[in-house]
């Protein structure tokens, strides 16, 4: 079920009235659903733009069309038009399922480690142009990672590994006892912090 607040409905209705196109509504879709890059997209939709398989939600003065393939990802979504502490108003969309759900505790350790790496660790490393890939997860809970991008050859990779990645994985995935680096950092060609300049 998707909730759209009265304020958001009023906001959309005014925008649609300004466009002056008969039958215009708003289409909601999930982009890159089930991934860390997932996002919700809202756009005007004229009747000719619709494919016919959208879910239609009647709102005050317009229809919200949800792209059929996006419906499972938008379950529980909330659309609101809020006033921020600065006084500015902003449309917000909260879609708790859009990035997928963490694997259940019954899932393999490999699945749980990969999910945390892709959904929690890599988005943080991306701010430095870096990433890590899970190379192996041993039966006794040792995770072997390979750094890439700005982390490949970075002088702070050891700190990132021990204080960031290992701490996160050990805290989020029961059974992980250590995290090790399998990267040949000497071959990194664009490190965020060159190894010879790291403190």
Curated annotation (Swiss-Prot):
UniProt-annotated binding residues for [4Fe-4S] cluster: 151, 154
UniProt-listed Gene3D superfamilies: Fe-S cluster assembly (FSCA), HesB-like domain
The keyword Metal-binding is annotated on this UniProt entry: yes
GO molecular function terms noted in the UniProt entry: 4 iron, 4 sulfur cluster binding; iron ion binding
Superkingdom of the organism of origin: Bacteria
Pfam families xrefs: NifU
Recorded family membership: Belongs to the NfuA family.
Complexes and interactors: Homodimer.
HAMAP family: Fe_S_biogen_NfuA
Function: Involved in iron-sulfur cluster biogenesis. Binds a 4Fe-4S cluster, can transfer this cluster to apoproteins, and thereby intervenes in the maturation of Fe/S proteins. Could also act as a scaffold/chaperone for damaged Fe/S proteins.
Name of protein: Fe/S biogenesis protein NfuA
Organism: Xanthomonas oryzae pv. oryzae (strain MAFF 311018)
